[in-house]
Amino acid sequence: MYDVIFLLSLQIKLKLSHVSNTISEINGVQLYNSFVAGAQKIFENQALLNNINFYPVPDADTGTNLASTMYSIVNTVKAEENIQATALALADAALMGARGNSGIIFAQFLYGFSKDIKEQQTMNIKEFATYMSVASECAYYALAKPKEGTMISVIKDWANDLVDSCETTDDFTTLLLNALNVAMESLKETGKFIAAKAKTIVDAGAKGFVVFLEGMCEYFHSGEKTVQVANAEIIDSEWLGEDNHEDITFRYCTEALMIGEDLDKNKLTSLIETMGDCLVIAGSPRKMRLHIHTDYPWEVLEKVQTFGRVVYQKVEDMVMQNDLVSNRKSKIGILSDSACDIPKEMLEKYQIQTIPLTVSFGDEFYLDQLTIKPKQFVEKLEKSAEMPRSSQPSLMDFTNRYNYLTTHYDSIVSVHLNGKFSGMINSSRKAATAVSKTTGKKIDVVDSHNATGALGLCVLRTAEAAIGGMEHDELVAKSIEWSEKVKLFVSCVNTKYLINSGRLSTFRAMMLKLFKIKPLFTLDSEGELQLGTFSFRTKDNFKKILGLIKENYEHKKIWNYCIMHVDNPEAAQYLSEVVEKLTGRKPLYIEDACTMLAGKVGPKAVAVAIMEE
């Protein structure tokens, strides 16, 4: 209904406008401004697009993904009078910032539009129609298996009308308005293809493209010389369809951006097309972006690393996203990071969101727990000549995650890795402040002063309380309190990694190595890793851990504990059994340690985290 009203109002305005407003050609600045106007429409309709997202999977993020792609365009490109330069800049910014299936299709659409434009200041109507026709073909080419009744169908119908109509008008506004009318009719048809049981549903990506076109039409009609971007949210409930949460065939939405020389799309397609579905590859022989739904993102990235240099990657859990949309368990969202070492099934149970740290070996980098698994990490750790480096998620990563979560939760509590280990807390707080200001949602960030399983226990207890109905402010206070009630004990085997990570002086490490001593570390009250004691055998370290647990918790009630290990499940199981004898309860879980801990303490290390009631 909204689109019909928009179209009628614009048609009336056009009839009242003067012939002198005719626009027969456009330059780079006008092209840029029309894109900014289209982007603004995406921003305004972000929540709506999320709500009607049912294809290819119902993960409620099409609006977020398109908005992120548009933000990259708006914030990166500087308009030039030369239309070729501006078009190329728009395409490159879209490729760099594209997110999700629809974002990458849009990026390929812009690449197709820009790739054949000659060095020129302006573009006439016929040229515009011709280049947009090429753009439509390129959008189809990006998909391994194009599906009708989706975004690409609307793009094709719109572009075809431009080609048909450019012979009968010399005005850009009239041309775009006529084509918009065709795009709206095409949009109505998409529901027949994507949801036979829900005729009112339209494809979210296609709807996003139509919304973008509306912004372009408004710009050319208004004749404004500049366009200001304002944050806004409009939800048109008339467009919301029935729930139609089809089964998700592959769990992870996986993306990567590669650079190289003579990158071959067909070779890349054959390399990974059997590893999932919804494969989209956009870009040029020098820069390519891929999108695939898969159950094994770590295997996809392992293959892609051999194809070109990966400079960006993203993985999203669509099962978690779908569950959040259809079965939200709390009004407060809980966010942590991949250093929390919580098993996947528990993350699902409590709907805990995590944001990955990045780990790199030289030029190769990976997303902790997503594009590199603990066993892969240990293998690289032992073989690589270079020591791994961990880095925090970017400010944009946090901003995107908070923007997404605020569309589903009343407020958010983030509980993160010790600020002494990473600058993550600062990035999270900056993003939280900015998103809270624009959305009006309360977001609090807690420094747990902990890591690995100690952080995990804090996060799990916070999530459990949120599901139990605890209010936001009390939850934040309790989360801080619980972080002070947990202790971590880490038994190490190899001192090499302790030296490289700066946890031991070279002299002390040499002494430990000479006498084959196994160090035992603890976290102090400030979250610093401290050498507590040592033994000549790992099992003696375990006895000392038991002694420390008894010393600290003999007269206290234990809330729970967990065991972590670096590729040493046998020792972890043994430690679990001896701690169970002391406490009278099994561990909450036994889990592989995150790459951040593994890189610091080395293979075969084992740790226990324990929290008092």
Residue ranges with predicted function:
Residues T22-V36, Q40, E44-N45, F54-A60, ...:
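Acidic, glycine-enriched active-site microenvironments
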Residues A60-T64, R99-I104, A206-F209, R289, ...:
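Gly/Ser/Thr-rich loops at beta-strand to alpha-helix junctions
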Residues N65-A79, I83-L90, T371-T406:
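Glycine-rich oxoanion-binding loops at beta->alpha junctions
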Residues G100, A107-Y111, H416-T438, L457-L460:
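Short Gly/Thr/Asp-enriched flexible loops that form oxyanion-binding sites at enzyme active sites
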Residues E137-Y141, S153-K156, N160-K287, K303, ...:
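Mixed-charge interfacial surface used for oligomerization/domain docking
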Residues I281-A282, G308-N322:
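Conserved short beta-strand edge segments in small beta-sheet-based binding/regulatory domains
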Residues Y296-Q313:
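Charge-rich, low-aromatic oligomerization/scaffolding segments with amphipathic character
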Residues L335-D397:
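N-terminal glycine-rich anion-binding loop in soluble enzyme alpha/beta folds
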